Regions:
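Single conserved hydrophobic/aromatic residue that forms the stacking wall/gate
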Residues: 167-178
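Short helices/loops that flank or line small-molecule/ion binding pockets
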Residues: 37-38, 46-62, 125-126, 138-149
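Beta->alpha turn/N-cap motifs
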Residues: 49-51, 60-72, 138, 154-159
Length: 178
């Protein structure tokens, strides 16, 4: 019997691979296979879209997974999992950003994000009424083009926000093993 671990595609995959190498688990991230053998006969990996990992673990298709707290929260499945450990990789923060340092207080706030649950929770905690525009990419351009007052998005270095003259308030996000 083997254990199947769901790993995220994209920039986190290399960090996870390096972490696994430290404990003598190696695998080929360039493999075209859907389920990849590792150097440990008892362990296999599936490289999946990050947003799908909580579902694969929840339905028992994968035994464990690596996913960000942001994705886990957005999946609405966070109460179904135990966080086994914080892998201390993929350091980023959830950022509320706008073209100036003030969010309108006298009107409904137009917010662009691909994190609707987090966004609703944040603004609800501030007793702010929002009009939420859910986007899948290029979130940063929404206030520049005038379709939102602000954005809620993940930020790693803040370089893109700075280049676009966006000002942000942030909260840490971690990537646990679930």
């Amino acid at each position: 019997m083997s254990v199947l671990i769901a790993l995220p595609k994209g920039r986190l995959l290399k960090e996870v691979q390096n972490l696994f190498k430290k404990i003598d688990i190696e695998f080929d991230i360039d493999s075209r296979k859907l389920i990849i053998d590792t150097s440990q006969k008892w362990l296999k990996v599936a490289i999946l879209r990050t947003w799908d990992i909580p579902k694969f673990v929840n339905y028992g298709a994968a035994d464990i997974g690596v996913v960000g707290k942001d994705i886990l929260y957005e999946s609405k499945l966070e109460n179904n999992f135990y966080e086994l450990m914080d892998l201390k990789i993929g350091n980023c923060r959830m950022s509320l950003a706008s073209l100036d340092d003030k969010i309108p207080s006298n009107k409904k706030i137009k917010v662009a994000s691909k994190y609707p649950e987090y966004t609703k929770k944040y603004f609800s905690s501030k007793s702010k009424d929002i009009d939420l525009l859910i986007l899948k990419g290029a979130i940063e351009i929404a206030p520049i083009l005038g379709i939102s007052d602000c954005i809620v998005d993940l930020v790693q270095t803040g370089k893109t926000l700075k280049e676009l003259s966006l000002i942000h308030i942030s909260e840490p996000t971690r990537h646990p093993l679930i």
